[in-house]
């Protein structure tokens, strides 16, 4: 599917591209230009019903398909993603807005997720104990659980779906995906390539839409589990409603990630990492560096370096060469971000770089320039809330103890980083910080697909995280077999 031909995005149900029964449509915009590039249907629960029934029917045979055969389809799928790498990256940039280089990297992360899922024969192995008692043996076997629902966000339209459905189907499940209505084109292309790889009809289905589709998945009795990535309020809603309907749920939510810079840090390295982590993907990622806590002795130096580097950032259409910072996703998100910048000024923070004044902000598209606040306190909204935009807050502290104390007061706990050369400081940070993914001299400590994406507190709802062995546990259930064999 190309942008030029995707005037109306269709649902993908039972291996067929079908129109939604809904007549309601929502425009899909190129956020760099404001141009409408497609129309996506706001599908209904009837559409969800059709997709779930197709997935449930496909489960009967797919769950019995030999695990190596499932893996071979995924290996072919991985190669097709590689073959179409540049096309996929361009499509991400057009509908999401991030720079082409970042989109290219996102495709890589998606491919890595498929590679991990293709290892299903090893991941699905059970356990055996031959002699739990005289002549008696016990074994554990893994089985798929059924139809899975996946609800994905706009900010990583390839990587997050590839977190979900490849591993789920590798484990023998079937899948109904609801991509973000803001970025549906990439999901459609993923389905086309899955079909080309030989994935049977009904194993992967896509229903486009908004609230009705989400509720349809959460309420349907044949949907056995829900994987969600998105904002904190919606994640909490999905978790509560899903579990009320007796579903297994993993819901990845918001973040307010703290980066701690100590006196012995390599400031050149710290500056480079923080700039990339704070302003990459326009700050629209749950691992973005949104708060820096820096020891007072080096605070002036760090702020000066950060502002100088932020001033060098090229802002514009992500398809243009040398652009680093693209737009935020929609005009209302741009206005929301400007509202947070206004509140930071009103609450007394020092605005040392004003992203409202960049030239690109005044033109077409939904641009906000890199914004840096100094002298931020934890009473301010810009410290408390997830802004999900290129806005960085700097808090000055007297010690590592104070920095950790401040970070731990946040209700979010996705990631945290420390910049230091001290092993003792790293150990203290590791043992006392309340966060699930940690970095040492690394700006974005997002793990590879074979490790769990492990947020804490209000950054995650559930027991089993996405990816890694947690993902395998989430998408499977166990049978225990105890046998007595006598001569």
From Swiss-Prot:
Pfam families referenced in this protein's UniProt entry, alphabetically: Aldedh (PF00171)
Family to which the UniProt record says this protein belongs: Belongs to the aldehyde dehydrogenase family. IolA subfamily.
Function comment: Catalyzes the oxidation of malonate semialdehyde (MSA) and methylmalonate semialdehyde (MMSA) into acetyl-CoA and propanoyl-CoA, respectively. Is involved in a myo-inositol catabolic pathway. Bicarbonate, and not CO2, is the end-product of the enzymatic reaction.
Catalytic function, reaction form: 3-oxopropanoate + NAD(+) + CoA + H2O = hydrogencarbonate + acetyl-CoA + NADH + H(+); 2-methyl-3-oxopropanoate + NAD(+) + CoA + H2O = propanoyl-CoA + hydrogencarbonate + NADH + H(+)
Residue sites binding NAD(+) per the record: 154, 178, 181-182, 231, 386
EC number assigned by the record: 1.2.1.27
UniProt keyword Oxidoreductase present: yes
Entry keyword Phosphoprotein: no
Protein name: Malonate-semialdehyde dehydrogenase 2
Database matches in InterPro entries: Ald_DH/histidinol_DH (IPR016161), Ald_DH_C (IPR016163), Ald_DH_CS_CYS (IPR016160), Ald_DH_N (IPR016162), Aldehyde_DH_dom (IPR015590), MeMal-semiAld_DH (IPR010061), MSDH_GmP_bac (IPR023510)
PROSITE patterns in alphabetical order: ALDEHYDE_DEHYDR_CYS (PS00070)
Molecular function terms, GO-annotated: malonate-semialdehyde dehydrogenase (acetylating) activity; methylmalonate-semialdehyde dehydrogenase (acylating, NAD) activity
Pathway membership: Polyol metabolism; myo-inositol degradation into acetyl-CoA; acetyl-CoA from myo-inositol: step 7/7
């Amino acid at each position: 599917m190309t942008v030029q031909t995707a005037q109306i995005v269709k649902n993908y149900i039972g291996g067929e591209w079908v129109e939604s029964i809904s007549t309601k449509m929502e425009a899909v915009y190129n956020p760099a230009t404001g141009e409408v590039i497609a129309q996506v249907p706001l599908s209904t629960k009837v559409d969800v019903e059709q997709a779930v029934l197709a997935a449930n029917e496909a489960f009967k045979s797919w769950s019995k398909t030999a695990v190596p055969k499932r893996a071979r389809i995924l290996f072919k799928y991985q190669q097709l993603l590689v073959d179409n790498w540049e096309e996929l990256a361009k499509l991400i940039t057009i509908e999401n807005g991030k720079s082409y280089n970042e989109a290219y990297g996102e495709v890589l992360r998606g491919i890595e997720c498929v590679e991990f899922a293709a290892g299903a024969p090893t991941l699905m192995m059970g356990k055996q104990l031959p002699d739990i008692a005289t002549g008696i043996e016990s074994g554990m076997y893994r089985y798929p659980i059924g139809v899975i629902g996946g609800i994905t966000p706009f900010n990583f339209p390839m990587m997050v779906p590839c977190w979900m459905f490849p591993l789920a189907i590798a484990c023998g499940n079937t899948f109904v995906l609801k991509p973000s209505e803001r970025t549906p084109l990439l999901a459609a292309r993923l389905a086309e390539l899955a079909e080309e790889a030989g994935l049977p009809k009904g194993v992967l289905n896509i229903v486009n839409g908004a609230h009705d589709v989400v509720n349809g998945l959460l309420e349907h009795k044949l949907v056995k589990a829900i994987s969600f990535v998105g904002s904190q309020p919606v994640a909490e809603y999905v978790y509560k409603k899903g579990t009320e309907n007796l579903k297994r749920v993993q819901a990845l939510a918001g973040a307010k990630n703290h980066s701690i810079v100590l006196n012995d840090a390599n400031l050149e390295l710290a500056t480079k990492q923080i700039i990339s982590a704070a302003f990459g993907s326009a700050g629209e990622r749950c691992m973005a560096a949104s708060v820096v806590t820096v020891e007072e002795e080096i605070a002036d130096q760090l702020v000066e370096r950060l502002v100088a580097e932020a001033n060098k950032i090229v802002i514009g259409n992500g398809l243009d060469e040398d652009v680093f910072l693209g737009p935020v996703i929609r005009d209302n998100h741009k206005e929301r971000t400007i509202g947070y910048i206004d509140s930071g000024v009103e609450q007394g923070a020092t605005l040392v770089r004003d992203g409202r004044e960049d030239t690109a902000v005044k033109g077409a598209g939904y641009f906000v320039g890199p914004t840096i606040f100094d002298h931020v306190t934890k009473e301010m909204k810009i410290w408390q809330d997830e802004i999900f935009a290129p806005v960085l807050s700097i808090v000055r502290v007297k010690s590592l103890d104070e920095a950790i104390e401040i970070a731990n007061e946040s209700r979010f706990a996705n990631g945290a980083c420390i910049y230091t050369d001290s092993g003792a400081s790293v150990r203290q940070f590791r043992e006392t910080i309340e966060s699930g993914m940690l970095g040492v001299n690394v700006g974005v400590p997002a793990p590879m697909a074979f490790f769990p994406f492990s947020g804490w507190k209000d950054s995650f709802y559930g027991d089993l995280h996405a990816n890694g062995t947690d993902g395998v546990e989430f998408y499977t259930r166990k049978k225990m077999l105890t046998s007595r064999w006598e001569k």
